[in-house]
Amino acid sequence: MIIRYDFSKMVMDSTMNGLEQNFNDLNCSPVEIMVEHNRDLFGDFKFSVRGNATKMLEEALAYVRMRGLPKVYILIDEYDNFTNQLLTAYKDPLYESVTTGESFLRTFFKAIKAGIGEGSIRTCFCTGVLPVTMDDLTSGYNIAEILTLKPDFTEMLGFNHEEAAEYLRYVIRKYGNNEDRFDELWTLIVNNYDGYRFLPNAHPLFNSTILTYFFKNFAELSGGVPDEMVDENLRTDVNWIRRLTIILENAKEMLDALVIDGELIYSQPDLRSKFNKQKFFDLDFYPVSLYYLGMTTLKDNYVMVLPNLTAQSIYMNYYNELNQISDDARCFVPAYRLFMDHRKLKPLVENYFKEYLGQFPAQVFDKINENFIRCSFYEVLSRYLS
């Protein structure tokens, strides 16, 4: 028997009472659905309390235990979705209230812990973005196992090269009508979607979500390459960077390290599967925080980098936004029209230096290097050329 919760559907509120009400409105139905789907086992069972997700779960689990029914599997998708929203909205006091004491959320997880201990729950599997909320929720929850950094688990987080190549050949055969395009398309997807390493010595993986996004659009276009190389839903909200770094100068310094130096140095002992909110916002911990947000990946035991051209382009967008660099199309389109007519690169280079680099103050040019030129020029080109 399975109970599936999806916390990403949680409606936000600015008060504790409002959040608790929204939590109950969302999470009463999953246990009701489990009971109805297994009515042959639950017989004439009825809930004595409604409108309280924790009490309804406890009642159903008590019945399972008393009648010796099959154990329950609990799945919680995006367990930290709404608590992360509290953090990005600077509602730290409300976050603390939700994740400490006898809050509705801690009480809910205590009910799950009790169910596991008493034998009515076989296991509870949670997915989320950060281990921060789990650390705050499960202090003393000593039966939890964190899979995040286990090698066998990280290998499942994307496609390896063999799997991606097989996937590409299948899509080309079915939708591309020309198997000679393999090398061309392979180079394209490696440059844009490969390069993710979740452990220092791991093999690189393709991001399965955006690779599948590309293939889906490739199929819909009957073998055409989509203009948009990345699903917009995967662009991490720039508010995370603002919230993580607290002040603008910290954000700029961090972005400078990635788009100018091309790397962030990290301490390997910091790469852990569980840490609290205070650690997450610590200045020296930024590289690992970015790793968990999906913004960087591991190059080796000492350095984190942006994994591919897609990530570099997204980061340059962040950089431009935080530095108030205009992307007014009227300043760029004439040069790209000229390029399309005559196929000469010089107008694009001149346009880049005048309209993009020309927006920076003179002192910035002391820091600008080849890596920055390459990343920023590619980002500008990708706006107008597919």
Please provide the spans of the model-predicted regions.
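Substrate-engagement module of ASCE P-loop NTPases
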Residues: 59-68, 94-122
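P-loop NTPase nucleotide-binding core
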Residues: 1-72
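Structural recognition of the conserved hydrophobic beta-strand(s) that form the central parallel beta-sheet
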Residues: 75-77, 106-107, 121-129
